[in-house]
Every structure is written in C-alpha cells, then in structure tokens.
UniProtKB/Swiss-Prot annotation:
Function field: Converts 2C-methyl-D-erythritol 2,4-cyclodiphosphate (ME-2,4cPP) into 1-hydroxy-2-methyl-2-(E)-butenyl 4-diphosphate.
EC id: 1.17.7.3
Domain of life, source organism: Bacteria
Residues that, per the record, bind [4Fe-4S] cluster: C492, C495, C526, E533
Cofactor binding note from Swiss-Prot or TrEMBL: Binds 1 [4Fe-4S] cluster.
Protein name: 4-hydroxy-3-methylbut-2-en-1-yl diphosphate synthase (flavodoxin)
Pathway linked to the protein: Isoprenoid biosynthesis; isopentenyl diphosphate biosynthesis via DXP pathway; isopentenyl diphosphate from 1-deoxy-D-xylulose 5-phosphate: step 5/6
Pfam families with a match to the protein in the record: GcpE
Length: 585
C-alpha cells in the first residue's frame, strides 16, 4: 500500500506548506517548528496572566494561548495584551474559543490568532442520534456559514490568523451521525469550516486534529494531510500538533512523544504544544526536546537511497500486523498475544529477585532467550534465508545501521513474510541517547511503530538500568493502548476554565486507583469540554463549579456538586458500585 500522506514512509521529508503569520511569528514554510503553550490563569486576572505569559516567553515559548469562554473574558484580552506589550513582550497571543462566536469576535480585536473548535463553534452537543437527509445537512452547513462568516471577514481584514482545531471528543452531533466518532469525522469537521473561509478568500489558516488516544490522533492527522493533498496544492496549510489530556509526569511526556513524535517523523507538523497536567512553563522544554531533531537547522530531507516497497499496512487505519505464533521459554509471542517486553540478559537475571516488587512491570524475556535474527532490511542477502525457515522466527534490525529505527522497522515489516515476528528497538546505537531524551526518543520510535501495528516485542536499549528499561517499555505500551498494565488516565492540562486544583486532584486519584488494571479515568477541569473530551473513559471526574466536582460514568453525569475534598473518595465508591474495583495488593 502506497503512502498518501507523505512522500515516503522510509525516509524523512518535511511537508511543504505555505507560511502563515501569527503576529510577528511565521508558521510553516521554511520557519522552525514553533513551540506553544497555554496559560492556566483565569483570563479575568490580568496580573496573573501577564506574569505567567512572561514566564513562558522567558522559557522560549513562541506562541501563547488563553481561554476566552465568554465575551466578558475575551474583553480582558485587551488589558493583557497591552500590559505584555508595555513590558516588551511581543509573543503572539491566541484566544481559545468554544461555543461562543461573540467571544471570538471580541477576542479577535485584541489577539493575533483565534482558535476555534469546529465541533462546538456553532453546534451545541446534545448526543442526539438522528439521520440527516442531504437537504437537512445542507441547511446545517448554511447555518454554520452564516455564523462563521463574520469572524472570517474580521480576521481577513485585520490580519488575524486562525486555527481550525478538531477534537476527537467534541465532534458535533451532525458530524457524529454522518461520519461517526472517527478520524474521518474529525477531518470533515475541519474541512467544512476551511471551505467557508476559502470561499471568502481567507487563507491564514492552521489545522489541528487532537485526541487523547494517540492511535486516533496519528490517524486523523495523516488523513487530514491526505485529504488536503487530494483537494489541491493550494491546501498547503500549516499544521499544529498536540495530544489532548496527555496527563503529567513521565506518562504525559511519553504519550505526547508517541503522538507528536510519530507525526514529526512523517514530516508533519509546523507548531506543537505538549499538554501536561503541570505548570505551563514545564511544557516548553519538553516541546523543544521533541522538536529539536526535526528543526530545519538540524536536518534536511533524506535522499532516496534504496528501493522503497509498498507499505505492508494501511497507515490511515490501525490494524495489528498479524504474524505467526511462536513460543520462547514458555512465553507466547505473535498471533493475538500481548506485545512482550524484553531486556538484555544480565539485567533480566538481575531482576529475578525483584519479581514480586516489579509485579506486572516485570520483563517477560531476556534478549538471549528470544534468539532474534538480526538483519539489515535493505540487504537481500540478509533477508533471503528467512524464507527457508520452517517455523516463524523473531527478527530485528541490526545495531549500528545508519538508519532511524522507525524507517528501518517499517522497511523490515514490508520485506519479510507476515509469519515472522518483529522485535522493536528504541535505538540502533546504544549509548547515543542520554538523560531526559531517553524516554522521549524511545516513545517516539517504538510508539510510532506500535501505532502502525508493527511489533511483537520491545527492547529498550537506550536505558542501561534494566528496571527502568522495563518500566519504560510497559509505559510505552500503555500510552499507545497496546497493552494495559494499570489504570489509564485522561487528564487535561488545565487552563483558565479549570474550576479546581487539577494537579493535586490528579495525583490523589492516581494514588487511589492506579492498581485498577484496564480502568480508564478522565480528570477534566471544567464542563465546557469535559464530557466530550473524556473520549472512551469509564469514569469521569469533572469540575462543575468552583471546587465542586461532578462524577461521570462514560458520558453520563451521575453525581453532582461534590466538594473537592470528598470527591476522590466518592469516585472510589462509584467505581465499586459499578463492579470495577479490586483491592490493591
């Protein structure tokens, strides 16, 4: 299968886009990949917003977003912008708009860019199931055009940029009923708005396709690029990358690295934000670590250096590569088996005394037990002997090759028979990555391949401590949804809409529930996006009023206005009520 979203899945080529100016910052074209973040302060609090924005600018943030949930909030953007400019800070400001076209019109007077969510800019989500006739659908689009046109015309006349940012969890009922809760629906939602803007000769557009599920996120961005390529060469708009509700700590960093890093490897992405449930300033250095290897100053497009076969999978629809079935020391690999975690021999045997402490994070095999066949996927002489093997074998890429792991393993998957299994590696040059780059690089390389459905086992070579290497391997499997070994969390990064201390609440919820393998809990700051953005969570903890929490089962609110100090205990009670609780070991 040919790649339709990038020139080649086997080498780096940055997607060519037009330049869009966001104030004094160029996005796309030949510009660097720009780093963004979002204020957590209340937009009505001018001093707090200015202080936080100055800290972000000092940290290297190039574009700063603020929430503007009503026209009154948006009006205070005038004061924030004036104070920042008076302080000598000229970082462009972006107003984040949901549900309120009048807030967008007010905000556009004062900031350099407007972000709209096409799922709720006009449509009010009611979770209704209905069939739309073509005529009814057209009427809805006409209503959308009527509401959206004034903002487009204002932005065009005043030099404002706009991001059309679809979110997986907040698609409109109209889109859901026609396209489903899918990447196709996310793309169509954005294209509808973009077509209206283009018809009005407005082109200062940036797009995003965010989701908390990284497989959905990667598929949606790829599908967006494929769709824009098909629509014509003048649909060459820049793209902003982000994983919504990635969480905090190492989990949030790994999840962001999987989603954002996968797309950067594909040459997609002109701006990015790492959304962490932490102070906003802590997002910036992580964003730079992710983007640095792909900045134009660091690398150029790779030349064609070997014959490039068709892909062995559909990059727009996730499907696990189904290899054969093999048994190694009592551990099954391959067909319908979980992806396994391996570590080098010495580390594996050293960990045997820690089996009880390691629990579900214990590596299942040593590298020696796997007896993997190492090959250069470009070399016919290495691959031909595999055809003669009677049984499925586990194959990996040789260390030391001058290839990036993602491209090397994609090539391997395309060139070997499906019956053979694949051992993924985070790096082909052990020792070449160090410090904080180790988990980000591993998550980018292994996570990208897992999102492509490639891999039957993983080996972390960049981390020398076998315990940490095993934890990292399982955390990457968790982040991609490939294999769950503990509770999973969808946690929003906080913004000016957040109604309680979300960092503290998230930490308490994790401490109480982390042992609940396979249970997915959403921790959301407010009811503006909370119910929609919870995606496929089993339970939700959502701010309903200042320091008051509403609890959800799936998308349904079941408990209301619980004082924050009681809410975690009540969440545990709810999990017990629905039969998902087990006592920690």
């Amino acid at each position: 299968m040919q790649s339709s979203y990038c020139p080649s899945p086997y080498r780096y080529t940055r997607r060519v886009t037009r330049e869009v100016m966001v104030g004094n910052v160029g996005v796309g074209g030949s510009n660097p990949i720009r780093i963004q973040s979002m204020l957590t302060s209340d937009t009505r609090d001018t001093d707090a917003c200015v202080k936080e924005a100055l800290e972000l600018a000092e940290a290297g943030c190039e574009i700063i977003r603020l929430t503007a949930q009503t026209k009154a909030y948006a009006a205070n953007l005038e004061n924030i912008a004036r104070e920042l400019r008076a302080a000598g800070c000229h970082v462009p400001l972006v107003a984040d708009i949901h549900f309120k076209p009048d807030a967008a019109m007010e905000a556009a007077k004062w900031v350099e860019k407007i972000r709209i969510n096409p799922g709720n800019f006009v449509d009010k989500k009611k979770f209704e199931v209905r069939e739309y006739s073509d005529a009814e659908y057209r009427e809805e689009l006409d209503r959308l055009k009527e509401e959206f046109t004034p903002l487009v015309l204002f932005c065009r006349e005043h030099g404002r940029a706009m991001r059309i940012g679809s979110n997986h969890g907040s698609l409109s009922d109209r889109i859901l009923n026609r396209f489903g809760d899918t990447p196709e629906g996310m793309v169509e939602s954005a294209i509808e708005f973009a077509q209206i803007a283009r018809d009005l000769d407005y082109h200062s557009l940036v797009f995003s396709m965010k989701a908390s599920n990284v497989k959905v996120m990667v598929a949606a961005y790829r599908l967006l690029v494929e769709r824009m390529n098909a629509l014509g060469p003048d649909w060459n708009y820049p793209i902003h990358l982000g994983v919504t509700e990635a969480g905090g700590g190492e989990d949030g960093r790994i999840k962001s690295a999987v989603g954002i890093g996968s797309l950067l490897t594909d040459g997609i992405g002109d701006t990015l934000r790492v959304s962490l449930t932490e102070d906003a300033v802590r997002e910036v250095p992580v964003a730079y670590r992710l983007s640095n290897p792909f900045q134009p100053s660091e690398r150029s497009d790779d030349p064609v250096s070997f014959p490039e076969p068709e892909l062995s999978y559909d990059p727009l629809k996730f499907s696990k590569r189904q290899g054969g079935l093999a048994m190694y020391y009592g551990v099954r690999l391959g067909w319908e088996q979980p992806v396994r975690v391996a570590v080098p021999d010495a580390g594996f045997y050293a960990l045997q005394t820690e089996r009880e402490a390691m629990g579900d994070m214990m590596p299942e095999l040593s590298l020696g037990q796997l007896d993997a066949i190492e090959v250069d996927p470009r070399c016919d002489a290495d691959l031909e002997p595999l055809k003669e093997l009677a049984e499925p074998s586990i194959v990996t890429v040789k260390n030391g090759l001058a290839m990036e792991p993602v491209y090397a393993f994609r090539l391997l998957a395309a060139r070997i028979e499906d019956r053979h299994l694949i051992l993924l590696k985070d790096t082909l040059v052990p020792g070449s990555v160090s410090g904080e780059d180790v988990p980000l690089t591993a998550a980018r390389n292994i996570g990208s391949l897992l999102c492509d459905g490639i891999g039957d086992a993983v080996l972390i070579q960049g981390e020398s401590d076998p315990r940490l290497a095993s934890f990292l391997g399982f955390n990457i499997l968790q982040a991609t949804g490939t294999r769950l070994t503990r509770a999973d969390y969808v946690s929003c990064p906080s913004c000016g809409r957040t109604l309680y201390n979300i960092q503290e609440a998230t930490a308490r919820i994790r401490k109480a529930t982390e042992h609940l393998k396979g249970v997915k809990i959403a921790v959301m700051g407010c009811i503006v996006n909370g119910p929609g953005e919870m995606a496929d969570a089993d339970f939700g903890y959502v701010g309903g009023a200042p320091n008051k929490i509403n609890l959800y089962v799936k998308h349904t609110p079941v408990k209301f206005n619980i004082p924050q100090e009681e809410a975690v205990e009540r969440l545990v009670d709810l999990i017990k009520e629905y039969g998902r609780w087990v006592d920690p070991k």
